[in-house]
């Protein structure tokens, strides 16, 4: 085991364990994750409802959210989505699988997993209830669409949906700065906390590339020890999954950086 990394992602915090060789060196580093993120801005102003949970993959033509200019249909969706009895067997089976998978893989040493699991189940429930609510009032939806006051937001490219902005959307391996590794400077704007949206403002964010990077500042000695190789093994402490990453070492303003390159499965 070579190192343990915590890096900025999601809230931009997660943990990796990086393995190289056979000697364990349990150092912890802060790192920055960079993905190809595109902010999708709204064409309309109104009440917003979301139908895809954070971190879900979407295909071309999938429904992500809806904008209701006068709010009537949105209120009906919100009211109908409070009824848990409307969850169909398919969605219920998916939620049960999520629970069973968590119970099977749960490790008491990583109690933080409970919070992630809770958020995931709540998001799945919210997604299922909102979609069912939308279908249950299809006549009202169709009427509002005909009146051009209700708008479904459909994806035009596949990718992974997220609902926050943080100012890192245009950061690359070529333009990152040392200040970006200071977590005290990090702030995140949660798009789902606002029940209404203005035209031209962000409604969601799409990650449309399977390639991504983690940038980690490392001591000179570490950079020197890695210079003769280009591949490293990573174990995700969150779920114990493992992956291999290629890497390069870059020096900038007197600091050495390990740049990990990964491809999502």
Please report, for each region that a protein language model flagged, where it lies by residue.
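Juxtamembrane extracytosolic/periplasmic "stalk" immediately C-terminal to the first targeting helix
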Residues: 13-23
């Amino acid at each position: 085991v070579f190192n343990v990394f915590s890096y900025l992602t999601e809230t931009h915090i997660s943990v990796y364990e990086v393995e190289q060789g056979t000697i364990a060196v349990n150092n912890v580093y802060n790192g920055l994750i960079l993905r190809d993120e595109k902010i999708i801005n709204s064409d309309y102003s109104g009440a917003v409802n979301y139908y895809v949970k954070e971190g879900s993959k979407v295909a071309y033509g999938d429904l992500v959210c809806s904008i209701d200019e006068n709010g009537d249909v949105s209120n009906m969706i919100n009211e109908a989505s409070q009824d848990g009895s409307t969850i169909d067997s398919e969605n219920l089976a998916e939620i049960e699988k999520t629970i069973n998978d968590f119970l099977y893989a749960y490790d008491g040493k990583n109690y933080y997993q409970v919070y992630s699991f809770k958020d995931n189940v709540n998001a799945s429930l919210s997604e299922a209830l909102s979609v069912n609510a939308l279908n249950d009032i299809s006549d009202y939806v169709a009427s509002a669409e005909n009146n051009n006051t209700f708008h479904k937001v459909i994806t035009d490219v596949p990718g992974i949906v997220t609902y926050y902005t943080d100012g890192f959307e245009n950061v690359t391996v070529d333009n990152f700065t040392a200040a970006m590794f200071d977590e005290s400077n990090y702030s995140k704007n949660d798009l789902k906390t606002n029940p209404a949206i203005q035209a031209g403002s962000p409604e969601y964010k799409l990650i449309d590339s399977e390639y991504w990077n983690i940038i980690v500042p490392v001591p000179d000695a570490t950079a020197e020890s890695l210079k003769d190789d280009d591949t490293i093994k990573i174990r995700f402490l969150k779920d114990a999954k493992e992956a291999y990453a290629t890497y390069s070492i870059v020096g900038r303003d007197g600091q050495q950086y390990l740049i990990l390159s990964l491809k999502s499965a």
